[in-house]
A protein has these predicted regions:
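S-adenosylmethionine
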Residues: 1-455
């Protein structure tokens, strides 16, 4: 791979030489292909055709030996699985750690995925969270928000709200009718970034990279987190992630959030065999001293039988060549304040309020008009009769072609299914049937042989 100008020198100023050399070598490797199954759709023993092992930090994740034409598989459109990069599935391990650790005692009633499109992390969150926990999946970009709504509808869980709004507008909407009535218990901020972790997959990530672009992204990330901070309750959890390697967008931003907004970093236990790295900076030996006492505290309060083999990282780096996945970074912070306090004083620090006044993206300040809620119930007709389709019929349905339903099919709205998984709706008129699959979701790509990953 031809790396951007200044890439090597930029990282050598910040990382050890051997770590830079390993990163450059890893970026020359081939990216892996991975999917994550929907536990509400497929049984635990389900394994895709061409599976090449499970993703170690996410039991629902599988590597594939090669990349099939996913569009030609009806089960993808039915929400039976999601094509997701393996490193980003680390969110599953983090959320399970948060929910099941005796230390956090998180009452998970409302969760926000702030920058959620196209939906990989939101679908993962929805699979892990309690059914009575409300998930708000947000995307500020209108086109990407439509894709997010489609994927959440297909994943098939009723307790989801998809919104299109900026972070500041969401913070202002807390308490408004029809939205969250209280600050969020957990916020995932998978913030826009310079995209270093996607360089093996996307030429644009290579072309756009520069030290100045990294600095711009780091500033934007701080602004986004500052804007959403009032929407996180005192004692609530922020999961911060990027698909980058550099310390400006990663370690330094997390430390800035902790220092300026008021939070503590939470070390995450990881298996050494996973290959996940911690703080990558040259001076990390000094920085590690800051976390040593905190790390011991969490070990004592959350003892596990195999704790001696676990590494606790306040920063989690996924580096190509060292993990089987693309570049990714994640850290967890807990907002200062009592978990019982949800008052405005707990929710907003003076520094956060000062930054909010400087923000130019407020518009007219009307949160209700600035926040758009997108429908996710377009497939909801659970009481309708079900009609099973063949593989070829399922693809034709997904292309919005006309189908002839069996003669015994009841008239009216029916659910059409493939392998027992609902694809969508049709209206049977007797002599013909109207295809009600949403036009904007239809398969537009050229011909591909229909297939499915799950027999």
């Amino acid at each position: 791979m031809q790396l951007p100008k200044d890439f090597d020198s930029y990282f050598r100023e910040r990382w050890r030489d051997e770590d830079v050399a390993a990163l450059v070598a890893g970026l020359d490797g081939e990216p892996s292909v991975s999917i994550r199954v929907n536990p509400k759709r497929l049984p635990p023993e389900a394994e895709p055709e061409g599976a090449d092992g499970r993703v170690p930090w996410c039991p629902e994740g599988f590597y594939l030996k090669q990349r099939p034409v996913f569009t030609a598989d009806p089960l993808l459109h039915a929400g039976a699985y999601y094509v997701q990069e393996a490193s980003s599935m680390f969110l599953a391990h983090v959320v399970r750690t948060i929910l099941h650790s005796s230390f956090f005692t998180l009452r998970c009633q409302t969760v926000l995925d702030l920058c959620a499109a196209p939906g990989g992390k939101s679908t993962l969150l929805r699979s892990l969270l309690p059914d009575d926990c409300r998930l708000v999946s947000n995307e500020p970009n209108r086109v990407r928000a439509q894709v997010l709504a489609e994927n959440m509808a297909k994943w098939g869980h009723p307790n989801v709200v998809v919104t299109q709004a900026y972070a500041a507008d969401i913070a202002h909407a807390i308490g408004k009718a029809g939205f969250a009535q209280r600050p969020f218990d957990l916020i995932l901020a998978d913030v826009p970034c310079s995209g270093e972790g996607m360089m093996r997959k996307e030429a644009e990530a290579v072309a756009q990279w520069s030290p100045s672009f990294v600095a711009e992204c780091a500033a934007l990330q701080r602004s986004i987190v500052s804007d959403i901070w009032p929407a996180l309750r005192a004692g609530g959890i922020l999961i911060y992630s990027t698909c980058t390697f550099n310390p400006e967008e990663d370690e330094e931003n997390v430390e800035w959030i902790a220092r300026e907004l008021g939070a503590e970093m939470i070390p995450i236990p990881v298996e050494p065999s996973w290959g996940i790295r911690g703080d990558m900076r040259k001076e990390r030996e000094i920085e590690d001293i800051k976390y040593k006492i905190q790390d011991i505290k969490y070990k004592i309060q959350d003892i596990r039988a195999h704790q001696s083999s676990i590494i606790n990282h306040p920063f989690c780096h996924f580096l190509p060549g060292q993990v089987r996945g693309e570049g990714f970074f994640m850290a967890v912070l807990r907002k200062h304040g009592s978990e019982e306090g949800d008052s405005e004083d707990d929710a907003e620090s003076p520094k956060a309020l000062k930054r909010k006044k400087k923000d130019k993206r407020k518009g007219n300040g009307d949160a209700a008009s600035a926040l758009t809620v997108l429908p996710t119930d377009v497939l909801d007709e659970t009481g309708a009769p079900r009609v099973e389709l063949s593989l070829e019929e399922a693809i034709r349905y997904l292309q919005r072609e006309a189908l002839v339903l069996p003669a015994e099919t009841p008239r009216g709205i029916v659910q059409v299914c493939f392998r027992g998984q609902r694809l969508g709706l049709m209206k049977n008129l007797g002599t013909r049937a109207n295809n009600l699959y949403p036009k904007e979701w239809r398969i537009r790509s050229g011909y591909a042989i229909p297939h499915t990953l799950f027999a």
